Amino acid sequence: MNLVTTIITITITLSAVLATISFWLPQISPDAEKLSPYECGFDPLGSARLPFSLRFFLIAILFLLFDLEIALLLPLPWGDQLNAPTLTLLWSTAVLALLTLGLIYEWTQGGLEWAE
């Protein structure tokens, strides 16, 4: 058995064992005491479960997408040293065009507007 097959087998086995353990370990029926918020032993003054802003979530997702884009384009200056630099530049241009179209779509749909 070669090294890659051994590593893949160990990874799959470990993942299955951890998924099974995480499925069976939590309590099946938590009581009201565990579901209540804890504020230093005092009764909560207000609702501890505040609604999460969906706008903030969308902007955070957009930030992650463009951060990933920058990470993908960082090795681009070394791409011109390959045998076929035209293909590398073509793919990077396609990625930039796709993300630019996505940004334009989000902008036209109002996804970047913080206040309505």
From Swiss-Prot:
Keywords (alphabetical) are: Electron transport, Membrane, Mitochondrion, NAD, Respiratory chain, Translocase, Transmembrane, Transmembrane helix, Transport, Ubiquinone
Q: Which GO terms describe its cellular component?
A: mitochondrial membrane; NADH dehydrogenase complex
GO molecular function ontology, one term from the record: NADH dehydrogenase (ubiquinone) activity
Against Gene3D superfamilies, the record matches this protein to: NADH:ubiquinone/plastoquinone oxidoreductase, chain 3
Its membrane topology, per UniProt?
Answer: Multi-pass membrane protein
Organism classification, top ranks?
Eukaryota, Metazoa, Chordata, Craniata, Vertebrata
Question: Can you tell me which family this protein belongs to?
Answer: Belongs to the complex I subunit 3 family.
The molecule here is called: NADH-ubiquinone oxidoreductase chain 3
Residue stretches spanning the membrane = 3-23, 56-76, 84-104
The kind of enzyme this is, by top-level EC class, is translocase
Q: Its domain of life?
A: Eukaryota
What is the catalytic activity of this protein? a ubiquinone + NADH + 5 H(+)(in) = a ubiquinol + NAD(+) + 4 H(+)(out)
Give the chief site where it resides. Answer: mitochondrion
Localization recorded for this chain is: Mitochondrion membrane
For this protein, the Enzyme Commission number is 7.1.1.2
Q: Report the protein's function.
A: Core subunit of the mitochondrial membrane respiratory chain NADH dehydrogenase (Complex I) that is believed to belong to the minimal assembly required for catalysis. Complex I functions in the transfer of electrons from NADH to the respiratory chain. The immediate electron acceptor for the enzyme is believed to be ubiquinone.
Which organism was this protein described from? Oncorhynchus nerka (Sockeye salmon)
